[in-house]
Amino acid sequence: MFIKIKETKLPRLYVNCYGKGDPTVVFESGLGCTHFDWEVVQNQISKNTRTFSCDRAGLGNSDTGDLPRSSLDQVHELHTVLNKAKVKAHYIIVAHSIGGYNARLFAGTYPKEVSGIVFVDCSHENQFEDRVKRSSSKEIEIVKSQSIGTEQTFDELLISAKQVSEIREKDALRNIPIIVLTADHKGETSAALTEEAWLKYQGDLVTLSDYSKHIIVEECGHFIQKDKPQVVIDAIKGIVNGMSK
């Protein structure tokens, strides 16, 4: 279905609400990605509790709004859409890649509404700034002149990363359960980030909570929800079941 946000210049955002029960599992996609990435996982989780996925502005079935926008802008829009769709807290946020920024900002902005987070090979707030430090001025200009996906330029990503760094000071995730799923990226290479650096960043995400678990997903690429959907399903169920104890 489509949700209109009159408070902004976004005419319509496309959302999927399936299942019944509490908590609500909210899926947050990676940069330039849509709800289709979660199709298998959402269909399975919807058999046990309520689920929600949304195409951000300019992606999938949603209309194009004012682009680009920072992660904090996207978080405020997500909160508005959840309210308009009458999808009430508590939320377990399942985030992929750059969607991890949004999950952390959401938890920091609306701390009483988030009961858990599953990070699916998520980005770290320092990785883009570190890339700038390791690049020549010419390389930086090339990267900054490019649009990343259809949502954010490199400069907007740096702004979003700064927002996450600032929200980290609130320590909003300290007492909520989180599971960090990290792909071994078999068969994938990246000139922007070494495997050692990626694992360091992933390990740091684990320290955000005193109730955290880190799972390395072997034989898997960046899109764990597609390559190994059962791993994501099991992680979500682990947090949901833990809440009922």
Q: What are the residue ranges of the model-derived segments?
A:
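Conserved HGGG/HGGXW glycine-rich cap/lid loop of the alpha/beta-hydrolase fold
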Residues: 11-61
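Active-site loop/oxyanion-hole signature of alpha/beta-hydrolase fold enzymes
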Residues: 53-94
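Conserved hydrolase catalytic core segment
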Residues: 88-126
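Flexible "cap/lid" loop of the alpha/beta hydrolase fold
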Residues: 118-151, 194, 200
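Active-site nucleophile elbow and catalytic-triad environment of alpha/beta-hydrolase enzymes
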Residues: 152-170, 197-204
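Short beta-strand/loop motif that positions the catalytic acidic residue
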Residues: 174, 180-182
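Conserved loop-alpha-helix segment in the C-terminal half of the alpha/beta-hydrolase fold
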Residues: 187-220, 234
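Catalytic active-site module of serine/aspartate enzymes centered on a nucleophile-bearing elbow/loop
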Residues: 212, 218-245
